[in-house]
Amino acid sequence: MDTEALKKSLLKKFQEVTADRLQKIQLGVLDLEKETADQAAEDVARELHTMKGEARMLGLAAIGQLAHAAEDVLRAEREGKTATEVATDVLLRACDVLSDLNEDLSGANTGNPASEEMVRMLAEVSGQTPPAIAGARPVAPPPAPPPAPVAAPVVTPAAVAAPPAPVQAPVAPPPTQAPVAEPGAHAAAAAPHPAAAHGRDEEAPSAAKSAVADRSIRVNVEVLDALGLLAGDLLVESARGRLRSSETEALFERFSRLGDRFLRLAEEIDISNEVREQLDRVESDLHMLRDDAFRFVRRNDDGINTLHGNLAKMADHVAEARLVPLSTVFDAFPRAVREMSRTQGKEVDLVIENADIGVDRSMLGDVRDALVHLLRNSVDHGVESPDTRQQLGKPLNGRIRIRVRVDGDMLHIEVEDDGRGIDPERLRQAAISKRLINAVQAAALSEREAIELIFRPGFSTRDQVSELSGRGVGMDVVKRKVETLGGSVGVSSRIGRGSTITLRLPQSLALMKVLLVRLGDDVYGMPAADVEAVMRVKPDDRLEIFGTLAVRHRGKPTALVALGPLLGLNGGNRFDKPPAVVVRHGEDHAALVVDGFVDEREVAVKPCGGEFLKAAPFIAGTAALEDGRIAVLLHVPDIMAEVRRMARPVTQAPAAKRLRVLLVDDSPIARATEGALVKALGHSVEEAQDGEEAYVKVQNNTYDLILTDVQMPKLDGFSLARRLKSTPAVARIPVIILSSLASPEDKRRGLDAGADAYLVKGELGVEVLAQAIDRLT
């Protein structure tokens, strides 16, 4: 990733996280005067410390300094050196200043008068001397100490927005001490809601529902389908109009040049004055005609461009209207899983994440059917019985997790269980017994290829038909449904730990961003989400591994395949034509050689039916282009399966040392920053938000290295290191502590706890991290 782009991304993420963090801090500060003060102080201290570390990591010195000063006030309050009421007031005001700095990061490095004054105020309250901020403006000390502040409550926007703590009865403020708004406070935020002011709180929900109902109508899905197709066709037609407009302009240019040539020729020949005068009038008319023509073309261009833009917006709105939240079908799953597990004498918990993400409504039925089958498989085949789980040391209740995320135009739905996993050897034997493959073929299968046997029609490892599954409708049906929608299915599993099935689907069937390439005179498209890079294959980058052609891509050998012959096309591309598209599917990559690139654009997709897919397995659909041609859209998963079959030796080439690293930090900013460094070294990263979660992950997975922060909820980094080193099964995994705590005492505590290395976050870089990792692994 580009360094500047990464920094912008991290700063944006910092702003989002810090806004939520400040809300938590303010709620915690308000609890300092309550019975839960000890827990509140601990929570506030952790949030302030994490914010300070994140800010310093991103070079936001003013925010880091202000958070540090706030920590001092909190510590003084806990030690009884500062009155709780005074500490509460000043910490809330500090939150306001931090919020202002966070909204506009331009002053978050060197600070501004408000932040500098706030640091001094915090230092006075805590009895500390504030250190200077690097790059800050020197400020003269005040000539005399300020007068004691008037004890008046301070109302801030965040405080107004925060949910009130429960009370026994409403308490009115004293009439002589009206709340005073800070200069930066928004009056609208402080104003009471009209309904609440008149005692009509209960009427608000019904009024809101009525307002929503007034803005909503039911639309038949067939109407939306027709609108989607029409919008796509109109978009293509408007693009053709733009093309014709460009061609018209080029035609007028040719006409203008021809007129100029004619007039120059007339000037060179000897003609009478009368003819000369007529030619002059013709010249004048030609210039007027040319000017009128160009004005017409420009007006036409403007109109067509406006039309095209509006049609593009309309197509986007239609595509958005087709999206419905997955919760529409997910809401029925908890009860379904409960009933399935009861029939099996099992207890299974279902966890669903991000069910509010939308999917094309025409896909809902197929998505529901596929997921129901996956849930049935997880309950029946995956999760063990309570007795077996108890013997294995697992929780008696099994767990199935449905996780949804969006990656570009594609939707990823993962169904994960913590059951017995999939045994590749058992699948090989089942395939042999069912005569799907012979023993030689089974032995040649890699572990992943053996697991993918579950997608063979009629394949099952069950000898008996159960009430729940095993009735001849298998994973091949799931795969076929998903691929008919232009998607793909992936599976990963670890014996004894569970399995994960991932459905990868287009979020919308109306429009898709594709990369268009040329093979001969024809145009083909690949989903942009499947394209990792485009490149020109240099002779020096080509290599041969075990008789298979490959190319170096990002330092690793990648199968090099001519796309034309793979699709069964005669002639066309050869390896002396350098353009190539690097596509990916799961962990597989391939460089597909083409004849040329066209461009990347959004197209209206017309999917092919299942019968067509059987006859042409590499084809996912078609799209009309503005020049009248039809682009054939390729199904990358099928192509990658064929490439894997053709280029199997490439996957057997010796790979560079690649570690599986567990990164433990409660700060998402720190995880993103440190994770980028680890990935830059070529290693894979998994994350945990605290020591407790990390220890569970280590028990259930295999890692080559653990990087951990120190100050975290539930289980801190020192305690995590001690627990890991006292557990024989994982004691040999190297542990590196990454912390903003830089004192010799902190480093000694980390190493005494069992850490193999202690690195300070402020000094962290690729070289420092690489040296530590190389030394320990």
From Swiss-Prot:
It comes from the Bacteria. Disulfide bonds: none annotated. It is an enzyme of class 2 (transferase). The modification 4-aspartylphosphate is found at residue 709. Residues 1-108 form the HPt domain. Pfam families: CheW, HATPase_c, Hpt, Response_reg. The keyword Transmembrane does not apply. InterPro entries: Bact_Chemotaxis_CheA, CheW-like_dom_sf, CheW-lke_dom, CheY-like_superfamily, HATPase_C_sf, His_kinase_dom, HPT_dom_sf, Sig_transdc_His_kin-like_C. Residues 270-509 form the Histidine kinase domain. PROSITE patterns: CHEW, HIS_KIN, HPT, RESPONSE_REGULATORY. Residues 129-149, 164-212 are annotated as: Disordered. GO terms for molecular function: ATP binding; protein histidine kinase activity. One of its GO terms (biological process) is chemotaxis. Its EC number is 2.7.13.3. Gene3D superfamilies: 3.40.50.2300, Histidine kinase-like ATPase, C-terminal domain (3.30.565.10), HPT domain (1.20.120.160), SH3 Domains (2.30.30.40). This is Gliding motility regulatory protein. It comes from Myxococcus xanthus.
